[in-house]
Amino acid sequence: MQMPRPTEEDKARFRSLVPDDPRVQVRAMFGNLGAFLGGHMFAALLGSDIGVKLPAAELAALRERGARPFGPTGRGMSGYLTVPEGDDAAELLARAAAHAATLPPKATKR
């Protein structure tokens, strides 16, 4: 299976949607991008799809609006959904970052 690759425009759009917060890091991951806060990935770019990690109740509401599983296999990564067309992606990424901020920071790797 080949991993979807984003265009430079996709990458620029993703970066523009990530909250402007000094705690947030955008890092390359397998040719795609991930947004992290406290070591927790809260959003990712896979090809042209943007996925967010939100609390279960918010994921359920997002599913009702047409969100589909997010991940390279089509099966989906646990806790992540693809931002549906027409949704306010910047708002969803901000909510995902706020959720990540409530989690204890992950230990840094040496």
Go through each PLM region and give its residues.
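Charge-dense, helix-prone N-terminal extensions
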Residues: 1-110
